[in-house]
Amino acid sequence: MSRRRYSVFLDLLRQARIDVGMTQADVARKLGVPQSYVSKCESGTRRMDVTEVHAWLDAVDRDRVTFMLTLGHALDAQGLQTFPPSRF
């Protein structure tokens, strides 16, 4: 995933936390990790794998499918195709 695409993903992930009124420390407690882990994930310093994203979305009580659809729409709106045609 390109930096621009990953940045859109991180913005949505961060916004999901903020929308439910949770701090980074709140998410960290739910995940059983240090607050610094949440900070590094949100800043893009630490990339997340799919299982970590699922756990994060569960922690902030977000539906996974809805989140992914929202991500796709956000990428499309910014002209960042989800799957570049040249790759398929």
PLM ranges: what are they?
Residues 1-19:
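A short, Lys/Arg-rich alpha-helix, primarily the initiator
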